[in-house]
Amino acid sequence: DDLRYHKALKEDGFEIQVLPTFRPDKALGIDKADFAEYIAKLSEVVGYEIDSIETLKKALEERINYFAEVGCRVSDHGLDENLYIKASEEEVDAIFKKALAGEKLTAEEIKKFKGNVLVFLGSHYHKRNWTMQLHIGAVRNNSTRMFEKLGPDAGFDSIDDICYAKELSALLNAMDYNAELPKT
């Protein structure tokens, strides 16, 4: 998002403060069919090739900085499933490259990638005193009629009944271990 409307409201002297929210769900969507396409689009936005976990994190940090410049103070994450297994940077880099190559990932690899990136993001939110919102366990796009009319993620979701407490605890603990747990 180029945040042009947020900038325009500010420039026009709109009296009510309208601040952006940072929502990097697509950067975490390594299990989605359009993940490589999104990474290519993000590469265009930042102006360099994103071909490793290091360059992905660099790009995400740049986007966080951009959103912060426009007044962002909150991140928002839609997490559909269990979300954390500890992994090394080398493991996560290999998983990222595997996904970019179009190879199928295991459930464990998806959790390792998402958990690693969430911990990274959490540390940056903490540094900026941002709030990190986590929407866990949503059943998406429940209304076929509205999905066909409006497309995905248009507000027709509901709560799922998955168990996520242990992995959520592990994720928050990983962020807190280095005293980098953002407000959640």
Task: Report residues per predicted region.
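Histidine/acidic residue-rich metal-binding segments in metalloenzymes
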Residues: D2-E15, Y38-K183
